[in-house]
């Protein structure tokens, strides 16, 4: 249990230091550099080496890392693990300051993804993301990371005495009910550029140099290990940072194989992936083709490589809920700490089929990791993942898997300490094949 707890603590630290997709990618980048990976850029000509370790960023919120295999890539292909860096939250709108009751100052926000809104009330919140400032060229402004590392916001509940329906299905209006308060002002003129002044102070920038921002709310409190036997991890953003963390650790710990090992961390999965940095873009296929071209291959070699490749699409899965067991399939019922979950859908919301399932089952068998399966109830629609999207773009055989989770899309999700270690172990075995 000691190893599992140590690894779980590292996950909690990783998530706490990754309050936005931009910070997630920055932390991934730092870990990769510490382990001998070199950054390459899409705008440059690539000169890659066999057994070399590289990574590419896009939009500062998505990243693809890879270790070049020793074999001919057209024959040996790619072994890919994919996840995403974003989580449900609230994005801060432009000119967000709003004054209420001539006293409170609130921020105007927009829902990002599908959070369980009620879980965001009455919690210490903060702000993190990316700020764009003037650069040397109008075409190429500079960007800076911002993380206000203290609790500065709260979304207060309405007292039950004024909202008697709060415990019986109260409908939350995100334009009214979930706007966070940031403080109290004494003068209406204090409202002007209130947030911009905070940003400028945090970054040490002149306010005139700040052009725009991509800023989001996050829960300030750190995750923890809990349960009478330390069997649970409770944290924000387990979906999908736990899978990214497992994939990252597997990539840096794996031996160099004949195939090229790839870790793809996409942004914007929670809003459909249809962005230049999302899974529904050419990001992955562009990088894979450029790897082939860098070693003298042509487009036919690229298609051959795709045919000889395999991908694990890794996104959190649903565990059976202890209080709502009837919401799960009557037969297929994943439990926390009983291993990673293979996700299956007749409608191909998950891209797993018998061939790709067999591959991952063998990976688990070779690594000594238990596994489970998940299907939705036949009267529940369920969600989807990056798996069907990337498979559509690349035609790579793909399996959808994930760590079983409770309270998915809550501000505070719950998974198992054993499961996180299980997933990493299976990923490392996959990369070592």
Swiss-Prot record:
Cellular component terms per the entry's GO annotation: cytoplasm
Alphabetical list of SUPFAM superfamilies matching this protein: Aminopeptidase/glucanase lid domain, Zn-dependent exopeptidases
Key words of the record: Aminopeptidase, Hydrolase, Metal-binding, Metalloprotease, Protease, Zinc
InterPro entries in the record: M18_aminopeptidase_2, Peptidase_M18, Peptidase_M18_dom2
Enzyme Commission code: 3.4.11.-
Ligand binding (Zn(2+)): 84, 161, 409
NCBIfam families referenced in this protein's UniProt entry, alphabetically: PRK02813.1
Cofactor: Zn(2+)
Superkingdom to which the source organism belongs: Bacteria
Family in the record: Belongs to the peptidase M18 family.
UniProt cross-references to HAMAP family, sorted A to Z: Aminopeptidase_M18_2 (MF_00467)
UniProt GO molecular function: aminopeptidase activity; metallopeptidase activity; zinc ion binding
Any one Pfam family match given in the protein's UniProt record, by short name: Peptidase_M18
Name recorded for this polypeptide: Probable M18 family aminopeptidase 2
PANTHER family per the UniProt record, alphabetical: ASPARTYL AMINOPEPTIDASE
GO term, biological process aspect, one: proteolysis
Signal peptide start-end: none
Broad EC category: hydrolase
Organism: Clostridium acetobutylicum (strain ATCC 824 / DSM 792 / JCM 1419 / IAM 19013 / LMG 5710 / NBRC 13948 / NRRL B-527 / VKM B-1787 / 2291 / W)
